[in-house]
Amino acid sequence: MIWNNRLILALSLLLRLHLAISPSYIHPDEHFQGPEYALGNLFDWAHETTWEFRGDSPIRSFVPLWILYTAPLSVLNFLWKGQLSPREAYWFIRAGHALAYWILGDMALDRLSDSKKSKTKTLYLVGCSYVTWSYQSHTFSNSTETLLVLWCLVIIKESQQRHSMHHQRVHKFMDAGLLGLLIVIGTWNRVTFPLWLIVPGLTYLRKYLIHNISSLILLIASVALTAFFVIHVDSVHYDLEWTITPLNSFLYNSQGHNLAEHGIHNRLTHLVSNLPVLLGPLLILLRTPSQYWKSLQFQSAISGVFFLSLFPHQEARFLMPAVPLLISCYDINAVPRRFTSAIFLLSYVFNIIMGFLMGTLHQGGVVPAQHYLSKHVDSGSHTVVYWRTYKPPSWLLGIPEGELEILDKDHPLGTNLFKRVTDEIENIQIRHKKTMVTVLDLMGSSPEYVNDVIAALAPINPLLVAPVAGLKELDLPAYKEVWKTRFHLGLDHIDGLESLEPGLVVLEVL
């Protein structure tokens, strides 16, 4: 049994390494809420500034992006003598996210564990989770949120231990100051961050802070000073007065019609769908014996899941912090011993399938296609049409700012773009003659509409990026295949088994 566990752990480490650098594309937010904006601005690459960063009330803070992307990539670019490519930047930030979670996440879980047995169980099962292999290595703000939640809990736990052991006052002050700093960074990273700390925070206040007024005052001061600094930086960055992005985000998300644009879900979605999808068959081990009810991990998980379930927009990635927290509360003895091996085998199969699906296949051709196109379009004018793919991250093309025009549903043409995009054909041809690149995102368009657009653009030989499964629905003029990968699967247009054929191609219309 020990040998089997060690073998499985070794295989999970290999999967961690492989999926950390596999270019799957789980959700557009992993690009457009972080690298697209931060690195596009840093390197003056053409990029799309999404609505979160525009207007008089931006809802995304620049400070977490500066910490995660701008600062480290500036150093890397210096070491590369100013020759850093988008491809190298992409692999660096993906590997950085993976390593940060492997090192800092495991360290936090180690320090949160009450015994060697509990630590071994937690690190083993977290290491065997596909969420660790795939989601956590992607550039989601949720990935950062997970680490910040874990380390806030570490500080809370160790503060209470130091109080009972009468440690030096300087350690208590350092704990309070650092906790305040992390709370602000976490909140400005994601407005939902405090929800994970409400229940454990109340316990911390009742058992510790109420008896240590000096630490409470320092915690409040740390929060206030850090918040003031972040607000000042954001205000300067956006050239606005008193830009409080978490407040803007809260006000935006408190409006039902705004949430409706992103999708309205049943308030039980997190509980009955998202948690089982993230945790898999081992969710049955969450029997919650009395000792787990008292743990900070369980309190934090319940706090986050409960309060997030009050909001009608619910996506599985919102619960990423709950995965290591709840795994640490698993009770191996929750099921009869004769069923244990079967449940664990089922869990391994589940995580391998989900890991391969979300970590390798899911929209897995988009990023490699961008890497290919970055070399193909740097020598002249091109028009690239994307169909039935997630929104392509423009920064990966490495095109200088001002030389790329992006046409999609968020373009100033608005919905008219999808109604009569052919009205723009003449303008696209003009840009083509000026040695510019035009990206036309037709993700949700019908095959008939795509046929019309390609036919109108045929004189300038556009490139079409589309899934292999969708080509059968198109009636294209003569073309040649210039690039292809089999590691791509879109799950947004499933219509029978034929639509599940994997693959993404780049075609040049002749």
Swiss-Prot record:
Sorted alphabetically, which keywords does the UniProt record give?
Endoplasmic reticulum, Glycoprotein, Glycosyltransferase, GPI-anchor biosynthesis, Membrane, Transferase, Transmembrane, Transmembrane helix
Taxonomic superkingdom: Eukaryota
Which GO BP terms, alphabetically? GPI anchor biosynthetic process
Q: Which EC number(s) are documented for this chain?
A: 2.4.1.-
Q: Which InterPro entries does the UniProt entry name for this protein?
A: GPI_mannosylTrfase (IPR005599)
Q: Please give the chief subcellular localization of this protein.
A: endoplasmic reticulum
Q: Which residues are glycosylated?
A: 142, 212
Q: What is the enzyme's main class? A: transferase
Any single Gene Ontology cellular-component annotation: endoplasmic reticulum membrane
Any one Pfam family match given in the protein's UniProt record, by short name: Glyco_transf_22
Q: What is its pathway?
A: Glycolipid biosynthesis; glycosylphosphatidylinositol-anchor biosynthesis
Residues spanning the membrane: 7-27, 62-82, 89-109, 179-199, 213-233, 268-288, 339-359
Family indicated by similarity: Belongs to the glycosyltransferase 22 family. PIGZ subfamily.
Q: What does this protein do?
A: Alpha-1,2-mannosyltransferase involved in glycosylphosphatidylinositol-anchor biosynthesis. Transfers a fourth mannose to trimannosyl-GPIs during GPI precursor assembly. The presence of a fourth mannose in GPI is essential in fungi.
Query: What name does this protein carry?
Result: GPI mannosyltransferase 4
Record organism: Yarrowia lipolytica (strain CLIB 122 / E 150) (Yeast)
